[in-house]
């Protein structure tokens, strides 16, 4: 399998992580495109037999950090007319409310915790792979994940009130 095939295989995971990280489909697609361009340009640096998924997520993380630094230096506006992608089948109302609550809770996490929760929980990376992507010790990844999960749990349990009230 060539590097191009490996990148294509991991595109859905890269897009999912970018969308969860940025919460803006257009910016997420731009991040994925930049990541793929960088990976293709640096393919000579990839060591065959190593973990391509971790390599790609590391590139994405670095591109994201660089873009965030640039955005801090220049004022950036967000378009108001961002259309959400609709799923193939609409979720039940209860599922939609759960997803909304989870997305809102994820937004309240500090960036470091949200990144770890998304990489481990959503993308299924191991602690070691996540540590490599974020350039952090495995112990730091584990503590950020534990704190992030605990905060998510507290936020979601705080939303334990019913979404609909009975009207008399």
Predicted segments — roles?
Residues 82-107:
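Acidic, proline/glycine-rich intrinsically disordered inter-domain spacer in sigma factors
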Residues 1-16, 26-29:
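A short, charge-rich alpha-helical start-of-domain segment used by transcription regulators
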Residues 116-120:
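A short pre-motif secondary-structure segment
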Residues 34-51, 70-71:
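Sigma70-family region 2
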Residues 134-158:
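DNA-recognition helix of helix-turn-helix
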Residues 25-42, 125:
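Conserved RNAP core-binding helix
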Residues 80, 161-168:
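Short hydrophobic short-linear motifs embedded
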Residues 45-47, 58-78, 95:
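Arg/Lys-rich amphipathic alpha helix in sigma70-family domain 2
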């Amino acid at each position: 399998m060539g590097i191009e095939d490996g990148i294509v295989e991991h595109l859905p995971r890269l897009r999912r992580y970018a969308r969860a990280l940025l919460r803006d489909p257009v910016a997420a697609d731009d991040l994925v495109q930049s990541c793929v361009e960088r990976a293709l340009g640096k393919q000579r640096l990839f060591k065959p037999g190593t973990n391509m998924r971790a390599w790609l997520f590391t590139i994405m993380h670095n591109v994201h950090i660089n873009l965030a630094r640039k955005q801090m230096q220049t004022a950036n506006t967000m378009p108001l007319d961002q259309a959400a992608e609709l799923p193939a089948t609409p979720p039940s109302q209860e599922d939609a409310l759960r997803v909304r609550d989870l997305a809102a809770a994820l937004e309240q996490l500090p960036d470091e915790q949200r990144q770890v929760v998304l990489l481990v929980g959503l993308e299924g990376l191991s602690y070691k792979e996540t540590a490599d992507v974020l350039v952090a010790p495995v112990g730091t990844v584990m503590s950020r994940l534990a704190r992030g999960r605990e905060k998510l749990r507290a936020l979601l349990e705080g939303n334990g009130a019913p979404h609909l009230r009975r009207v008399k």
